[in-house]
Amino acid sequence: MEQVIGVIGGSGLYEMEGLQDVRSIVVETPFGAPSDEFVTGVLDGVRMVFLPRHGRGHRLLPTEVNYRANIYGMKKLGVTRIISVSAVGSMREEIVPGHIVIPDQFIDRTNATRANTFFGNGVVAHIQFADPVCADLSADLYAAAQEAGATVHRGGTYICMEGPAFSTRAESNLYRSFGVSVIGMTNIPEAKLAREAEICYGVIALATDYDCWHESHDDVSVDAIIAIIKQNVAMAKSIIRNAVRRIDRERNCPCASALRYAIITDKAAIPAETKERLDLIIGSYV
């Protein structure tokens, strides 16, 4: 199987030195339109697929992102691994704005307005999500960040809030009491849907601020976030480039068979319309 690596993040990530045969592709999905056109290319002999999570020009709120269409589109284009590049607030003193975190856990504080599963409409599945990121991909991202010269923290918990408003000070301190490392607004349900689609998922989290808990630092603001992101875009590209060289073509992780024992609905009971709609996701099992 051809290795195809997806990157979900800012719209500037695909403007990468060495990316060849760059094309924009409109992808239709049963779940509506993705955030924007997908950008494909070849980097060091590996096919890449990029998607600006919030659309070009940052048009979509975290709540408005069509996560199902985005992940389905990645699957349709043959992606087997997704690298998520995300701006986050630091919830720990030692994670300084400008540092990189490769989280390995999530806490979901989003609400029911986000569609967080491909299933329903006559088919029931329960994926294992105890370890929500791909350990192999995350290890490659950590090594790639070290190689790029980043100050990088391995592991930690990303708490995903609904937004779009930032936290109150009371909320920020509550989340710190949970022992989380960073806070963001986008990686859930993205990670859940990637697991349902049997796509490996790993995160490059760019710490931009201390949210609003740190008494010695300014509270989080959009202008501060943008300033740090601009500083870190080159670093994120370097990490991605290094990771692409490291990632094995073959997958030996459980992500590739996440649905093997997850679907509990009798095959004969699944409506034909649902089977057709989810054929790309469940076709090999039903």
Swiss-Prot record:
Pfam families: PNP_UDP_1. Its EC number is 2.4.2.28. CDD domains: MTAP_SsMTAPII_like_MTIP (cd09010). Phosphate binds at residues 11, 53-54, 86-87, 186. Pathway: Amino-acid biosynthesis; L-methionine biosynthesis via salvage pathway; S-methyl-5-thio-alpha-D-ribose 1-phosphate from S-methyl-5'-thioadenosine (phosphorylase route): step 1/1. GO terms for biological process: L-methionine salvage from methylthioadenosine; purine ribonucleoside salvage. InterPro entries: MTAP, Nucleoside_phosphorylase_d, Nucleoside_phosphorylase_sf. GO terms for cellular component: cytosol. Homohexamer. Dimer of a homotrimer. This is S-methyl-5'-thioadenosine phosphorylase. The gene is mtnP.
